Amino acid sequence: MIKIDHVTYRYDEEHTALKDISLEINKGEMLAIVGHNGSGKSTLAKHLNALLLPTEGRVEVDGMDTAVEANTLNIRKKVGMVFQNPDNQIVTTIVEEDVAFGPENLGVPPEEIRRRVNEALKAVGMEAYARSAPHMLSGGQKQRIAIAGMLAMEPEVLVLDEATAMLDPQGRREVLDIVGRLNRERGMTVVMITQYMEEALSADRVIVMADGRLIAQGTPREVFSRGRELRANGLDLPPIAMLRDKLIDGGMNIPADVITAEELAEAICPLK
C-alpha cells in the first residue's frame, strides 16, 4: 500500500535525516517504527503523507507518487496523522465541532459529516463528551479526540507520530487500546512511531531505526530477541526482554525469544 524506495532526506547539506531507506507497508498491517531521539523515525513518518518529500528516492501511496503535487490531497485523504501534542491538532472549542473540522474542509455534506462524527466519537469511546470543551479534558482524552478527527476523514492508514509521548500510563493504554481495536476490527493500517519499546509488542512487524538507517525489522519476537545488537545501537528493550537477558547472563537457561511476562514465568518455573 505504501512503498518507500531508496529514500534519502536532507534537511541541509550537513544533516541527512534518512539514508537510503527502502520499506513497504502492507494493507491492514500494524507496524511499529522504533528508535531513539534523532534516529529519523519521525522524519520517515512525515514522508508517508507528503508532509516531507524525499531528497532522493520515491514514496508511493497506492501507486501515487508523493512528489507529484496533484496527488497530495488524495494522499492525505488516505493517510491520516496524529502527532505528539494533541493541543496542536485541536482547533475548536467544542469536541464534536473539532471532529467535524476535517470533513467540513473537504466539502462533505452536513448529513454525512454528522454520521462520521458520531461514528468517530463512538470508535474512541468519547461520544459522551461531544459537547464538551476540549481544553477541559485529560491528555489521553484529547489524544482520543485527535484520533477521532482523523477517523472522521475516513483514512485507510493511521500514522501515530509519538502520539503517546506526552501521556501518562493510563492515557497511553487508552490510545493503544483504541488503535489496536481499529486495526483488528476495521482492518485499518496503523503505523506507530514510538520510543517506548513495549508499545511495539502489539505490532505485526517492528522496524528499528538508528542514525537515519533501518537496522532491523521483523516480528516483535524476532526483533527483541536481538537484545545485544539493539543495546549496542543505544536502544532499550521492553522490560520483560531486559529481564530475560539479565537472567540469561546470570546463567539461567531461558529461550532468547521470550517477550511476555507469561512466557518468562513459564520458562523460569521449571528451574525452581
What spans do the regions from the language model cover?
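ABC ATPase NBD Q-loop/coupling interface
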Residues: 58-74
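The feature captures the beta-strand-to-loop junction immediately N-terminal to the Walker
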Residues: 34-36
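Catalytic Walker B motif of ABC-type/P-loop ATPase nucleotide-binding domains
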Residues: 158-161
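Helix-to-loop junction immediately C-terminal to a conserved catalytic motif
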Residues: 49
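Conserved ABC ATPase "signature" region
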Residues: 111-129
